[in-house]
Amino acid sequence: MIHAFSDGGSRNNPGHAAWGFVIKVDNITIHSEGGYIGIATNNIAEYTALIKALEWLEMNKKNENIDFFLDSNLIVSQLNGIFKVKNADIREFVLKARQLEPSFKKITYTHIPREKNKEADALVNQALDNHLYGI
């Protein structure tokens, strides 16, 4: 089973924003990635992380079962059809996710506490610190 952990963050929301994701197979990290977006909201950053992870998985793990873990209850609830997507910008991200989902056998989205998403969160902060402070 493939587990994907994604996270996004925005300092001062909206503010400087970044994304990160970690892909694990049998609890071993096989890929991790993060990047700076620019000025954006936290939700845009969260969805950017999800899309970046889905795109990487489509290129490298097509036709597999994917379990996604996110610490944003809003995003998980929107992807699982519990909450409606009202924002037009966010709707574009949901449509992109829906276009990528058929590349996989099965895909699930599960909400987890922030403390269980530390690796993806660290990539977000690393990308922000690197852009803002050069560290």
Task: Report the location of each language-model feature.
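RNase H-like nuclease fold core
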Residues: 1-44, 55-58, 134
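Generic detector of bulky aromatic hydrophobic side chains
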Residues: 1-4, 19, 45, 72-74, ...
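RNase H catalytic domain
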Residues: 9-13, 51-135
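Residues at secondary-structure transition points
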Residues: 39-44, 48, 85-88
